[in-house]
Amino acid sequence: MKHLTSAEVRQMFLDFFKEKGHAVEPSASLVPHEDPSLLWINSGVATLKKYFDGRVVPENPRIVNAQKAIRTNDIENVGKTARHHTFFEMLGNFSIGDYFKEEAITWAWEFLTSDKWIGFDKELLSVTVHPEDEEAYEFWAKKIGIPEERIIRLEGNFWDIGEGPSGPNTEIFYDRGEAYGNDPEDPELYPGGENDRYLEVWNLVFSEFNHNPDGTYTPLPKKNIDTGMGLERMVSVIQNVPTNFDTDLFVPIIKATESISGETYGKDNVKDTAFKVIADHIRTVAFAVSDGALPSNEGRGYVLRRLLRRAVRYAKTINIHRPFMFDLVPVVAEIMADFYPEVKEKADFIAKVIKTEEERFHETLNEGLAILSEMIKKEKDKGSSVISGADVFKLYDTYGFPVELTEEYAEDENMTVDHEGFEEEMNQQRERARNARQDVGSMQVQGGALRDVTVESTFVGYSQTKADANIIVLLQDGQLIEEAHEGESVQIILDETPFYAESGGQIGDKGYLRSEQAVVRIKDVQKAPNGQHVHEGVVESGTVQKGLHVTAEVEDHMRSGVIKNHTATHLLHQALKDVLGTHVNQAGSLVTENRLRFDFSHFGQVTKEELEQIERIVNEKIWASIPVSIDLKPIAEAKEMGAMALFGEKYGDIVRVVQVGDYSLELCGGCHVRNTAEIGLFKIVSESGIGAGTRRIEAVTGQGAYVEMNSQISVLKQTADELKTNIKEVPKRVAALQAELKDAQRENESLLAKLGNVEAGAILSKVKEVDGVNVLAAKVNAKDMNHLRTMVDELKAKLGSAVIVLGAVQNDKVNISAGVTKDLIEKGLHAGKLVKQAAEVCGGGGGGRPDMAQAGGKQPEKLEEALASVEDWVKSVL
């Protein structure tokens, strides 16, 4: 057997089947396209369902692929076994009604045993077949020539997922030798049994039956082949290594993690688990983000968040206490660059997403662990071994702990979590959110008699803001009426209207309905259940009756502001993609006459320079006087043109395409300017984060932008007056003041350091000798954790050999820092373990390296007790 790299194995598989007349199907995105039944692409065949179920006929019925996949159903085993993964590659060859068992078996054997290809020793291969699949048995025994003792009949060799195509399968196993099992009494030591010696390297599924609803099986008119070979497992056999993690797909990641942690892989099972978890999870997250998924609290995003936070938890066991996963992205990208160049191309963005998520979790991790420690203690004191659903929800909602992460921490303490109670809390939160969404005035038009109103009403407001119309429906408080009088609120449906009804982020129009006998001021317009525009207003004069002929007129000033802001929103969307990356997608918007608000997907803050660039691009497009064209097109044609559609939005067969020159192309039902020059000016007012992976920009256009800029100039003039300088000199004057402030701060820190030295010197008298070891545990005055660590370092230097624990109270919170000199570390003393037990006394938690560690607590009144416990801990270790 030749030694091959993982890249060579993958390419060799594709090349082999290409020679056999197969078309190479590119690896599809991990995020399923038009398949709501799947959270992730989880197998090689998942992307080919359209061919197998007959929706699409492939140009070539023979297909081969190398497909990336994600499965997280066994996540708790990842890192603890040799071959469990959340991300993996599946190599497969497929036949859609073309060849069948004979070719599939013959080619599999050729690929595995031919010296031109893999070159396995034939004597080390065994196969399993279904007991009733005599055809496959005969092919293996007579055509291939495998001895009968190496053909095992197993009942489990039948692929069936319920109703639909099914059939027997045959699996090929490689014997790795007696080093992986040689106990003749082991009942599982056979190909297909639970053992490490005989590894399954290929599964060939013969899809020849239809599983009927009544439970019977009938032959399929066209028989298919579906095979799967796990690349990671195959490479472990070819490279002759004990686990998948020892292959060239993982080793570079593990080595990079060794460099970050200072620990060594292969010396300790607990630490090895951490290395494996990190190596597996970074591959999954990097590829998923590359394909457009982002961490969040739902769906795919929740999976990514859970994986990242699980990796952070395990990283602590190898002394990594900072964001680090993002540093591994270039390593993953390099390993996979030949076949998956997109990860390398997007490496900077992927790293940015991961770093942001890590930083967010680290901000709450220690505090969350302290809370969890309290929860565990509370339950144990009650004699309970279950963390309540309410507590699990608090950790999830406040501190970002996925329930599975809390469960893993609980397992360390021999406890479980109340999943049912947690789900109940989650459902209550969803109900609260749903009620909040529904508690809006616009929903009032959806009830009552409107459900039964089916008369037609035509919207003409794209081309005009004024129209003659008749009142065809008149309502008050949701009930049909014949007339309304001055001062009364009404809802009106016209046979024809220029008023836009709120949708797609654009607010409803305002204006007037006028006739000789009445005037109605329209305050809002919403869509009725059957699509008509419902005008909500107040009768300002006269009497309004059903059938009344009116002139409907939208406020020109209001509509003018709305259309400027709406077209500017389209320009902003494209500018965001240009500057921040193509991952940016609209997550929500609001378009009013005075301002626009645009929510978008993006990780990390948008820098000042990026905002300036975005604003400049939008203004350049405005000043370029670009025509805006609007057309109705079939949805397929619009998508082919590259029109941006809102994710999750439902569109009909014919869609409205809004195009701004060759710069922006979107599906949109809103109102727009005819030329970008009409917008005049665009000014960003604010940019902020509104949730995990979602940012918000608020901006103004036209007259609003002019007013905003004038306001900023006014503030600048006022600042210049206060600084007694002119506008141009303000930055210099501010810089000078900042320099003066820094000098004052440095002087203050110097004085604090001197005071710290004095205090450090003063507490040397508190040093005690415990079993021949200098131990110093004292409460001190320190403004923050950095100050506390500095004092510990100074005392270590002065004492030469000592265990030091200093505690301070700041803003009703406890800070503790511990230090152990090198000579005492060799005796088994560990600062991280010491500070953890001290912090627990104060209702907190923490940890760190053997020589230096820190922790926090929430009960300052127990600090003295915590410091007093240090001597006993040292004695227990020595």
UniProtKB/Swiss-Prot annotation:
InterPro entries from the xrefs? aa-tRNA-synth_II/BPL/LPL, Ala-tRNA-lgiase_IIc, Ala-tRNA-ligase_IIc_anticod-bd, Ala-tRNA-synth_IIc_core, Ala-tRNA-synth_IIc_N, Ala-tRNA_ligase, Ala_tRNA_ligase_euk/bac, DHHA1_dom
* Recorded catalytic activity of this chain's protein: tRNA(Ala) + L-alanine + ATP = L-alanyl-tRNA(Ala) + AMP + diphosphate
**Compartments in which it is found:** Cytoplasm
Positions binding Zn(2+) in this chain are: H566, H570, C668, H672
- Alphabetically ordered keywords of this record: Aminoacyl-tRNA synthetase, ATP-binding, Cytoplasm, Ligase, Metal-binding, Nucleotide-binding, Protein biosynthesis, RNA-binding, tRNA-binding, Zinc
Task: Report the co-factor binding details.
Answer: Binds 1 zinc ion per subunit.
List this protein's GO terms for biological process: alanyl-tRNA aminoacylation
Which EC numbers characterise this protein's activity in its record?
A: 6.1.1.7
> Where does it mainly reside?
cytoplasm
SUPFAM superfamilies per record? Class II aaRS and biotin synthetases, Putative anticodon-binding domain of alanyl-tRNA synthetase (AlaRS), ThrRS/AlaRS common domain, Translation proteins
Identify one Gene Ontology CC term for this UniProt entry.
cytosol
Query: Which one of the record's GO molecular function terms can you name?
Result: aminoacyl-tRNA deacylase activity
The record's function comment reads: Catalyzes the attachment of alanine to tRNA(Ala) in a two-step reaction: alanine is first activated by ATP to form Ala-AMP and then transferred to the acceptor end of tRNA(Ala). Also edits incorrectly charged Ser-tRNA(Ala) and Gly-tRNA(Ala) via its editing domain.
Designated name of the protein: Alanine--tRNA ligase
Q: Which organism is it from?
A: Bacillus subtilis (strain 168)
